[in-house]
Amino acid sequence: MKNWSHSKAHTPDSGLLGGEKKPGPEQIIMGLFNRLQQHLSPKLQRVWFKGLLYKQFDTVAIMAQLAIAAWAITHLGESDNPMLPLITLGLLVILLLLRFTFMARALCKLTIAAYGLGIEIRRSLLQHLVSMSVATIRGLSAGKIALTLSEDVQWQENQSAYTTPQIACQVMMLTLIYLALFWFDWVVAGSALLVLMVGMFILGAIRKKLDEILRLRATMMADVSEAIVEYAQGMSFIRAAAATTTVEQRFDREIDQLRVAFRRGVFRSIPLLSLFYIIIDTSVVVGILAGALRFNSPEALTLSEILITILLLFATMTPLRGIIPLLNITALTQVGETHIAEIEAVATQASGPLAAPDKYDVEVNNISFSYPGTNQPAIQNVSFYAPQGSMTAIVGPSGSGKSTLAYLLLSFYQLDKGEIRLGGNDIHHYQTQALYDTVTMVFQETALFQDTVANNLRLGDPGATQLELEQAARLANIHDTIMALPQGYDTPLGVDGGTLSGGERQRLAIARAILKQSPVLFLDEATASLDPENEQLIQQAFDSLTQNKTVFVIAHRLSTITRADQILVMDHGTLCDSGTHDELLGRCSLYQSLWENHLGSEEHWHLYPNKPNKV
């Protein structure tokens, strides 16, 4: 999945499907029909086809206007009926009103169906992303996924609401106009059409060039989007490191590369575009000349027929000149379709046949694991047993494999060897949703959404009552903080909970975990963001939360896990030792060192209220 990794490749054909033959507009339109059938309900499909039908009715009305104009050229000057001009004008007004009705209905129905299609494609993609393993998700580019869910799906909406119906109308209009031209004079029609065929060959070259330009644009836009995401996510570090100028320069380079590449591609296509528009005009001129050369022949057209022919020739210019913008959108749609297909092609996490376990002991048998692309094992030959209802703490120096071990226990990654059993069965034999319903996770990096406090809490239990929310919040020592917010539990949080402090976000996540009431609990640095006073209160909440649950805890502050049933001491991906706090203090030198460092950090963590400020 090269195109969805974090690596950059500025090639138009990069990506999962890039090496395949690029489809033409007809395949793209058929692909749209498949999307409509796949994602839209029968009712919305009927809405879309009704919109397309109204669009065709509008085209018929346009042709009727041309027919009335042609009839007026032939008959108005020869008729003595004074009412004929009024009748002609009345018919034109009626056609205008009909066109207004057809256009309004077409736009309404096509827009409803198009936005419905966009919603369903986005929903389908999100469901597919959710069904991927965490390891797979982490290997994808957040910027490119965001671009696909926004811009690429938007082009699908545009294609269904505007481009495909417009192409159908223009093809119909050109067909009817040339049929009329052939009926009046096949020489005029054939001459104009012959010149136009040359333009069609050039149009093929233009389509190929546009496709190349827009694929390159899409690749580089994805890189720019990725840079924006990285810039936003690393803003606090960038400012703290005074690296704003460096990052801005890098971002400017990305934008400049996009500008230069796109401008170069556009400049290369300008000669072909200009030639195509010239040929369109030339086809009209050649048709008129063909009629003029036959002016004195026995088969010459009458003056009124010549005027009608000229009118029809000029009428061909409107749909022909509209082809290039439609090809542009169609090419963008195909790029978007490729990106959507690439996400859909990413394998989802395999789900086993077993429902939720009825026992919650965890057995780890000789597991090893290396991150993709690395040869150094992150976890090597680790074995232990955690009885149901026990508390297991995982400690060790930075980089020792604590979090990786927890991720493996959560089935985020596939093991290289060994097995992990939950309730006597391999964790991979459980249905994915059943497994995640069994466990609750509180990570060091808390995930909060741009929604109300109550809705963020209800991610743990969608059916939780207000009373249950408040009880969980009190256990996590966050209720008073929530009530101090402007709208209490109905207060909207900023992006990633930006209106709360780090400790408050952590406690909100703990309250959410309390609500879920899963039998297996994972706490990754659960109290790392809390001050000493709140840490004691949270510890009391954990005592009630963890009753009769199988609990795994990772913590820097070793004082929070001294009462754990067992402590796993990790070092360089291996299990150095395991036991209770007292047992490890008596025999494990690494744990002794970690404990001494912890005590030293606690001793030096003070406030100095009486210390004078430095001037």
Segments predicted by a language model, with ranges:
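Membrane-integrated ABC transporters
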Residues: 1-62, 83-88, 106, 110, ...
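Helix-to-loop junction immediately C-terminal to a conserved catalytic motif
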Residues: 410
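Cytosolic ends of transmembrane helices, especially the final helix of ABC transmembrane type-1 domains
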Residues: 243, 267, 316-343, 352
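ABC-family ATPase nucleotide-binding domain "signature/switch" substructure
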Residues: 437-445, 456, 472-476, 490-589
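Transmembrane-helix motif of ABC transporter permease domains
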Residues: 45-65, 71-119, 138, 304, ...
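A hydrophobic transmembrane-helix motif
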Residues: 60-71, 98, 164-207, 263-308
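An intracellular "coupling" helix at the cytosolic face of ABC transporter transmembrane type-1 domains
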Residues: 38-46, 134, 151-160, 164, ...
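ABC ATPase nucleotide-binding domain helical subdomain, centered on the C-loop/LSGGQ "ABC signature"
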Residues: 123, 421, 429, 454-495, ...
